[in-house]
A protein has these predicted regions:
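A structural boundary/capping signal
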Residues: 1-162
Length: 162
């Protein structure tokens, strides 16, 4: 029987949560992230889109290095059914980095990894913290004036409403 390996990003998150301890705002945030953390698998763009559609994505989004939040946001504007996802991914199969990618139907794709870095996203581990529609992302970006940080911003809003 094949042993299923636990997602290393969730293990990493759990480890940091233990280091932080049980008290304080940071501990609360880590507990919430652990509740929301969802291991996912990303597929190649070619499993979801045609070559013509991939060329159109490159042309209209113009994805850039070190701008995954921008890339994922703009991609979600092109196709209304595409969701924006924030979470973490492994970097070269090692440590976790904060990252944004997209969900198309029931499949996850990462245009930054494929179209900018020319890397195979299926070789990395991913952990989603939140999936958002275009309206939510636009609202947050307009409010704060930059791309990204949707998950922590919404977390803080929910905490302040309580």
């Amino acid at each position: 029987m094949t042993e299923v390996k636990e997602n290393s990003l969730i293990v990493e998150l759990r480890t940091f949560a233990k280091l932080i301890g049980e008290e304080g705002r940071q501990a609360e945030f880590y507990r919430q992230m652990l509740k929301d953390a969802k291991p996912i698998e990303v597929v190649r763009l070619s499993e979801v889109f045609t070559d013509t559609e991939i060329k159109a994505i490159k042309k209209f989004v113009k994805p850039k290095v070190n701008e995954c939040y921008r890339n994922a946001t703009l991609f979600s504007h092109i196709y209304p059914e595409v969701k924006y996802v924030e979470g973490k991914m492994t970097c070269c199969g090692a440590f976790g980095i904060e990252h944004a990618w997209n969900k198309v139907g029931d499949k996850y794709v990462d245009i930054t990894m494929e179209l900018v870095l020319d890397r195979d996203p299926t070789k990395e581990e991913y952990m989603a913290l939140g999936e958002y529609d275009q309206e939510t992302v636009v609202s947050i970006c307009s409010e704060v004036g930059f791309y990204g940080s949707v998950y922590p911003i919404l977390y803080n809003k929910q905490k302040s409403e309580k």
